[in-house]
Amino acid sequence: MSETQIAPLTLNIQYTKDLSFEVPGAPAIYTLLRQAPTVNINLDVQVQRLQDDAHVYEVTLTTRAEATHPAPAESGNGAEGGKDLTVFIADLSYAGVFTLTGIPDNQIEPVLLVECPRLLFPFARNILADVTRDGGFPPVMLGPVDFVGLWQARRAQDDGETIANA
């Protein structure tokens, strides 16, 4: 039995890299809402290597929540009827600095694009829920995310672009 074992994945630090919350139609939008708005979520993962001589990476989980509500039919102010109004836009980039130790090269990509975002996700979900609630709206509660599926879709897209550029 060895005296010290080094964890293969170490989360050195995690932090809010960028946070933005906008309510472009305030305060009027609050009087129009009679039900929860429709919320569209976009999620992405970016990785940046921080040290050339070591496996130290910044992994950023980027989330954008954009809520819309149907425009009132009798606007009377020249606004386009039928076009959805933007209720709020929340942008969050939540990052962590990870050190990988003893992970085979062929496993680094899935660790960075699947396991690292999995560790960051609960914190990002909580921040997004808090900021939307504090903005006067029902909290946006993100459901579980299939990071394996996102990684596989990214690989398939990258493979398709490689073939198209050949």
UniProtKB/Swiss-Prot annotation:
Record GO biological process: protein folding; protein tetramerization; protein transport
Cell compartment(s), UniProt: Cytoplasm
Keyword field: Chaperone, Cytoplasm, Protein transport, Translocation, Transport
GO molecular function: unfolded protein binding
Any one Gene Ontology cellular component term annotated for this protein: cytoplasm
Family assignment from sequence similarity: Belongs to the SecB family.
Subunit structure as annotated in this protein's UniProt entry: Homotetramer, a dimer of dimers. One homotetramer interacts with 1 SecA dimer.
Biological role: One of the proteins required for the normal export of preproteins out of the cell cytoplasm. It is a molecular chaperone that binds to a subset of precursor proteins, maintaining them in a translocation-competent state. It also specifically binds to its receptor SecA.
Entry protein name: Protein-export protein SecB
Species per Swiss-Prot/TrEMBL record: Acidiphilium cryptum (strain JF-5)
